[in-house]
From Swiss-Prot:
Keywords: Aspartyl protease, Cell inner membrane, Cell membrane, Hydrolase, Membrane, Protease, Transmembrane, Transmembrane helix. GO terms for cellular component: plasma membrane. It is an enzyme of class 3 (hydrolase). It catalyses: Release of signal peptides from bacterial membrane prolipoproteins. Hydrolyzes -Xaa-Yaa-Zaa-|-(S,diacylglyceryl)Cys-, in which Xaa is hydrophobic (preferably Leu), and Yaa (Ala or Ser) and Zaa (Gly or Ala) have small, neutral side chains. Pathway: Protein modification; lipoprotein biosynthesis (signal peptide cleavage). This is Lipoprotein signal peptidase.
């Protein structure tokens, strides 16, 4: 009997993908470009177009970056699907991380492929400082990265504990 692989976590990719594209669709349908609706004293919903990557990285270049980010999203997603296939389903944190990153990367890739830009709309600010505007896909990618860091920390802690137990057993 074979064990379930990490591919069973791809439902999480699908959720991140669909929720991201649905929220972007709603923003594009309901907002004019740069229109902003105040939600909280530190938070607006603001429709912006991002021609680069996170924090508008490479946004001011001649257009080659669009193809670069599409290829990068495909390559990373393919690599992470491979890792999911190799992982055991019991590796919940790592599998969840990979799945969230895949969903976010592919959602932004579809947006970039279809529109030539990524729709961003979460706008947090304090006084005159505005954090870069972002979307659900960005959140999924960041949570995935955070989970990978957490998993690495937990794995390292377990290695240290295993060594301590091993030393105690040798005495």
């Amino acid at each position: 009997m074979s064990k379930k692989s990490g591919l069973s976590f791809l439902w999480l990719s699908a959720v991140a993908f669909v929720v991201d594209l649905l929220t972007k669709y709603i923003v594009v349908q309901k907002f004019d470009l740069y229109e902003s609706v105040n939600v909280l004293p530190v938070f607006n919903l603001t429709y912006v177009r991002n021609y680069g990557a996170a924090f508008s990285f490479l946004a001011d270049h001649s257009g080659w970056q669009q193809y670069f980010f599409i290829l990068l999203a495909l390559a990373i997603s393919g690599m992470l699907v491979y890792f999911l296939a190799k992982n055991n389903a019991e590796q919940k944190i790592q599998n969840s991380a990979y799945a969230l990153i895949i969903g976010g990367a592919l959602a932004n890739m579809v947006d970039r492929t279809y529109n030539g830009f990524v729709v961003d709309f979460f706008d947090f600010y304090w006084d005159i400082y505005h954090y870069p505007v972002f979307n659900i896909a960005d959140i999924a990618i960041c949570i995935g990265a955070g989970l990978l860091a957490l998993d690495a920390f937990k794995s390292e802690k377990k290695k240290v504990q295993d060594k301590q137990v091993e030393k105690c057993g040798q005495k």
